[in-house]
Amino acid sequence: YNTNNSVNTRLFAANGGINRVFFSVGFPLTKFLSFGLTTNYNFGKFEYESFNLYEGVNYGIYSNSSSDISGFNYQFSSNIDIPIKKDLNFNIMLSYSPSSILNSVNTQDLYTSTTNLINLNSLGDLVEVNLEERGLKSTELRVPKKYIYGVGLGNHNKWYIGAQIEKKFSSNFENRFLNIKNID
């Protein structure tokens, strides 16, 4: 077993998320059937950090990658409200969100550091990675299509019990910038 250049310290961190502003409209088609549409504007930022410090090497490598995300997606829904008794209704809900594209503007910086704590005393060289050259400065994230099915039973404005199932087709999700595949 060769211990030369084996990883002594390896750290990973991530933070961020997507915010959403939405507009929804719904209207009745019949006495028991209604239809709705939601338009979402998604925006946010993700940051990913990693640090590798190797035995026998003076400087470790610190990577800071970030993605600014923005884009629209849509959801179409229908609701069937069937009266069973005077104060008892049965509901069926169907919802469909087609696949959509979110735009990602990416940056990546690499640092060398003598410790796993990044501060002015430990920093070595700084390199801003040329993502434009690799075709990764602007990438697209495909939001998978999804279906939501729900049923419920209740007394209007008093009580309600229901169940919902969501089917999301996320097996083809891919983030080329971070080389992350098949995220659910």
What does each of the following model-derived ranges do?
Residues 1-184:
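Outer-membrane beta-barrel porins/channels
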